[in-house]
């Protein structure tokens, strides 16, 4: 039976509906905000696995073109593989939900939010998040909900919840926040150098709306009726010889956990793990049924040692204090033929960023249900297996897309717009080593690479990843976390920004929620760390280079009247093609009359610009042109002034008192001009004309333009005849 619940959030009502679509799923909810609707379903497998120590959750957000009344572009007229946007929204849904599933459930869980309609005013991603959270909460799958999400922007000094696309575009802060009744579970967004106080205020305001949606979900559950929850697949089992294992390894494991260097530390821990495995195998205390419990017990002891050292002694596995940042080495211009390059090394994490400048032809065209877009700034993040000393496939996965998007958001508010810098900009980050915080190393390397390439960025940007170790009310915030601190800790909070404020951030937690006080501490510690990193980067490069690389394409711009565009293009593109071929340039003509020339030769580009200016220039009486004789007849000669303009050189000799003499044109004859000089047969003011042939260049002057635009010319002479 169809059930409906409505609540007002911001400018529109958020509507939840269930019981009439996709009823065979474990849970299904249709959520609508304004004119945007998303159907979310959740299903679980019937196969139970007791050997899982993680939640086998997959989220597949997808958008249908029919939702916007569109048909997919390209040859294949159906939706294909997930676009980057769909992957990013899937991650937004996955990350706050994952910690709230019970690992003991032991079944594969799949959540599929599908955008069925969009009004192109309200972004469907937030609608999809709430549809998915509500579908799981109403289902029979064990889930520690409810949770909800909203988007907040900061625009003209005010916070707006669930803004329109236009408000997002114009805002100084765009943040997506997910949370429960008790606190925040996920934060992600970008900003234009906002302060920590503004960010915290946005999160605070978002949580108030989140609590309203969570309470509405509980009310909806009462209306629909709570389903009997599926049983957990297994109870938490403990390795029966755990205390013996502790006695055997604990002292040695304490030493191994604090060996200097990631590879050496991993090697020491692995040797001890193998040694203890062989020991318990020899005692016949390991079987197929408890082998996984043995490894879990070993990992639990490692986790306990590392966390206790940080909480109680404030010492991390590499010997640093909680707020200490690893040694930083920064370099620029390390690749000779690229347009810009930088290498950023922080401890055992290293990112090589390379900037390439292209033309508007290189822009990325996005065929999207929210409207087609053209991106002239892109950042691509690559994480090859050798960066962690492993073998594997070279491929772009969801993690690479997510990390690249975060780094791009951190940098894009500092990148100039098309009007100020009409290049397409692509930054590629190659992670050469990784031991934590590679996405923030990408931000640092990318910022320096842009400056190296001569991109006039507003300010330098740096990023840092913060961690958390907590036990009850006791907690320690960590600066510049290692990979193992991310794995064993409770939070991964990435913050990027300039000296003036924050430009990008992302927070994920593994505990139920974090408090405002804890977030304030983390942001302040991140700010201090960011200032330190920026100071190191500024010693290498602090401002963008003046001028771009000699290997980058050159650009010349000019503005013409809109009604002159057709003159530049010419019949069937003849004129613009001639310019392209003659001067070896690419010509981009925009609808507003802006013309951009791309090429490699400055001289040829300047000549191409002059040619276009001459084409669109309105002729005036008294102007002098280097014309070409196009046609000669008995009445005169037609002179091409520009590819789109001709003037007429009359056959009759004109004197200074505007009286005409006699004479006829013909190839090889001499023709008249007005302007004095030698006399012919004693007639004052009549001059001996030059000899002309078709195709010949001749210097002429405009002497008259009638109301119909007809141009009369006279010959300009450099010397007397």
From Swiss-Prot:
Family: Belongs to the polyribonucleotide nucleotidyltransferase family.
Cofactor(s) needed: Mg(2+)
Subcellular localization(s) per the UniProt record: Cytoplasm
GO molecular function, one term: magnesium ion binding
Natural source organism: Borrelia garinii subsp. bavariensis (strain ATCC BAA-2496 / DSM 23469 / PBi) (Borreliella bavariensis)
Source lineage: Bacteria, Pseudomonadati, Spirochaetota, Spirochaetia, Spirochaetales
Top-level taxon of the source organism: Bacteria
Segments forming domain KH: 553-612
Stored Pfam families: KH_1, PNPase, RNase_PH, RNase_PH_C, S1
Entry keywords, A to Z: Cytoplasm, Magnesium, Metal-binding, Nucleotidyltransferase, RNA-binding, Transferase
GO CC terms: cytosol
Record protein name field: Polyribonucleotide nucleotidyltransferase
């Amino acid at each position: 039976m169809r059930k409906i619940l409505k609540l007002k959030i911001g400018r529109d009502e958020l509507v939840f509906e269930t019981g009439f679509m996709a009823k065979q799923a474990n849970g299904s909810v249709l959520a609508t905000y304004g004119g945007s609707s998303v159907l979310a379903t959740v299903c679980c497998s019937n196969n139970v696995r007791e050997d899982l120590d993680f939640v086998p959750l997959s989220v597949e957000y997808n958008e249908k073109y029919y939702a916007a009344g569109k048909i997919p572009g390209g040859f294949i007229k159906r939706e294909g593989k997930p676009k980057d946007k769909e992957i990013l929204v899937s991650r937004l849904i996955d990350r706050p939900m994952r910690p709230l599933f019970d690992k003991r459930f032991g079944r594969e869980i799949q959540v599929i939010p599908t955008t069925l309609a969009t009004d192109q005013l309200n972004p469907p991603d937030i609608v999809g998040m709430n549809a998915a959270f509500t579908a799981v909460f109403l289902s029979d799958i064990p889930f520690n909900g409810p949770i909800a999400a909203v988007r907040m922007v900061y625009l003209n000094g005010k916070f707006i919840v669930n803004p329109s696309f236009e408000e997002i575009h114009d805002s100084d802060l765009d943040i997506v926040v997910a949370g429960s009744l008790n606190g925040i579970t996920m934060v992600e967004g970008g900003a234009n150098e906002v302060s920590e106080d503004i960010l915290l205020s946005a999160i605070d305001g978002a949580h108030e709306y989140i609590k309203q949606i969570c309470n509405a979900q509980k009310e909806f559950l009462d209306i629909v009726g709570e389903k009997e929850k599926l049983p957990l697949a297994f109870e938490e089992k403990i390795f029966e010889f755990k205390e013996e294992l502790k006695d055997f390894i604990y002292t040695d494991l304490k030493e191994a956990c604090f060996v200097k260097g990631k590879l050496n530390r991993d090697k020491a821990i692995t040797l001890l793990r193998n040694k203890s495995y062989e020991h318990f195998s020899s005692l016949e205390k390991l079987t197929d049924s408890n082998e996984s419990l043995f490894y879990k017990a070993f990992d639990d002891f490692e986790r306990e040692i590392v966390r206790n050292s940080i909480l109680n002694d404030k010492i991390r596995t590499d010997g640093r204090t909680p707020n200490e940042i690893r040694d930083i080495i920064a370099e620029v211009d390390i690749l000779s033929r690229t347009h810009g390059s930088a290498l950023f090394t922080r401890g055992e994490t290293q990112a090589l960023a390379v900037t390439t400048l292209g033309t508007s032809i290189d822009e990325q065209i996005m065929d999207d249900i929210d409207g087609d877009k053209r991106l002239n700034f892109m950042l691509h993040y690559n994480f090859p297996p050798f960066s962690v000393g492993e073998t594997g496939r070279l491929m772009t996965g969801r993690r690479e897309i997510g990390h690249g998007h975060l780094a791009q958001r951190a940098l894009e508010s500092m990148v100039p717009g098309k009007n100020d810098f009409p290049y397409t900009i692509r930054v590629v980050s190659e992670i050469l080593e990784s031991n934590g915080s590679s996405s923030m190393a990408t931000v640092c390397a990318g910022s320096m690479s842009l400056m190296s390439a001569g991109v006039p960025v507003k300010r330098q940007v740096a990023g840092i990843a913060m961690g958390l170790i907590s036990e009850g009310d006791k907690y320690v915030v960590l600066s510049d976390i290692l990979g193992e601190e991310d794995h064993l800790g409770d939070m991964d909070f990435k913050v990027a920004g300039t000296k003036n404020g924050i430009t990008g951030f992302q927070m994920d937690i593994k505990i139920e929620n974090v408090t405002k006080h804890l977030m304030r501490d983390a942001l302040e510690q991140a700010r201090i760390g960011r200032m330190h990193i920026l100071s190191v980067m500024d010693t290498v490069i602090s401002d963008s280079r003046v001028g771009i690389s000699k290997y980058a394409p050159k650009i010349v711009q000019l503005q013409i009247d809109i009604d002159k565009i057709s003159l530049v293009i010419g019949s069937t593109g003849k004129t613009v093609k001639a310019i392209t071929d003659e001067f070896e340039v690419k010509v981009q003509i925009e609808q507003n009359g802006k013309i951009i020339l791309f090429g490699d030769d400055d001289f040829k580009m300047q000549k191409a610009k002059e040619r276009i200016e001459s084409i669109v220039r309105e002729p005036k009486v008294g102007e002098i042109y280097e014309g070409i004789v196009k046609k000669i007849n008995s009445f005169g000669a037609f002179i091409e002034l520009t590819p789109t303009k001709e003037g007429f050189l009359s056959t009759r000799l004109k004197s200074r008192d505007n009286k005409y003499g006699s004479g006829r044109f013909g190839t090889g004859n001499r023709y008249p001009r007005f302007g004095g000089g030698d006399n012919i047969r004693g007639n004052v003011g009549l001059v001996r004309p030059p000899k002309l042939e078709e195709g010949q260049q001749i210097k002429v002057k405009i002497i008259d333009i009638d109301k119909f635009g007809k141009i009369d010319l006279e010959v300009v002479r450099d010397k007397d005849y």
